[in-house]
Amino acid sequence: MLNLIKLPQVFTINQVPKVFHEDGIISGYRHPCSSAKDCVLSLFQLTNETLNIWTHFLPTWFFLWKLLTVVLVLEDWRDPFIWPFLVFLLSCCVYPLASSCAHTFSTMSERARHICFFFDYGALSFYSLGSAIIYSSYSFPDKWVNGTFHLNYVSIAVVNSIISTALACYSRLGLPFLEYNCHSIKRPSGKLDQKLCKCLRIIAFVYPYLFDNIPLFYRIFVCAGEGCTVNEANTVHYQHTSLAFFTGFLFATHLPERLAPGSFDYIGHSHQLFHVFAIIGTYFQMTAIELDMAARKQWLHAHLPPVTFLNTVGAAFFSVVSGLCIVYVFSLSLFSTRGVKNKSF
């Protein structure tokens, strides 16, 4: 039966439009006007996207299992103390799923490619907010709890998640309707402009990460003496922080494929490694939070401001709705009332 299934053809970099090109990747490209069926079939053949997809699709199910375990098996969801952790676990399910879907269906057309990654950026911004919510609830150093920064921390993180989504979407094509529309779907052509777009995208995600981790950086790198929250979670926080910086390095540098173009087209290029280390880092982050929750539960119950629906689920809901509105606006200008057919390949 499997022999009757014809897998889609793959192409080299010179055979696909420039918008589909990746630095240092020479071969393994899928048809730039693939059908949805071809995109799904490509999961089962080796292309330069195959491992990008599976390295995020499979972990999605692990985080979903973890979420369902807390909700259905342990039934801890009734305790408000657990709500921030549930929001975080939901974000851990959403961002790898959005990423794997974006990489799967991004070759249906140029327009589909942009829209897929708009959603991907929104999901990453939601994950950054999920991280802020759990840090606020479980990982702030003792001496900062109930301080001005702590009381405003989640609100600022919500704003950051919205700015992050907007800036990341802007980095692809510019301002919708003003700088691009359905008749002009292209990235800036100059090398300087392309580098600026890359820098903007990096800033869009590095800035929220750095802000989210201010309390954690202070706790594990700076703080000394009483009120610094020293426990077994600190070692794991060191580990996931190190993995996060390495993940960012891979995303920014496109190593190793830039050193040997064509040698890592299918296995071992930076985006695959970026996915792998991002997931491992997220796992260590989750583990560190669980250790903080167990070790500090009594102290946090006594000193932490009340955990409410508004500052957990409400904050996440507002961020998600805002992100979807941003994605809608950036996607809307890629369409016209009459519709625009994809250019033939």
Swiss-Prot record:
GO terms for molecular function: signaling receptor activity; steroid binding. GO terms for cellular component: membrane. It comes from the Eukaryota. This is Membrane progestin receptor gamma-A. InterPro entries: AdipoR/HlyIII-related. Keywords: Developmental protein, Differentiation, Lipid-binding, Membrane, Oogenesis, Receptor, Steroid-binding, Transmembrane, Transmembrane helix. It is a multi-pass membrane protein. Residues 74-80, 136-148, 223-272, 336-345 are extracellular. Pfam families: HlyIII. Its main location: membrane. It is found in: Membrane. Residues 1-52, 102-114, 170-201, 294-314 are cytoplasmic. The keyword Iron does not apply. It comes from Danio rerio. The keyword Mitochondrion does not apply. The lineage of its organism: Eukaryota, Metazoa, Chordata, Craniata, Vertebrata. The chain crosses the membrane at residues 53-73, 81-101, 115-135, 149-169, 202-222, 273-293, 315-335. Belongs to the ADIPOR family. Steroid membrane receptor. Binds progesterone. May be involved in oocyte maturation. GO terms for biological process: oogenesis.
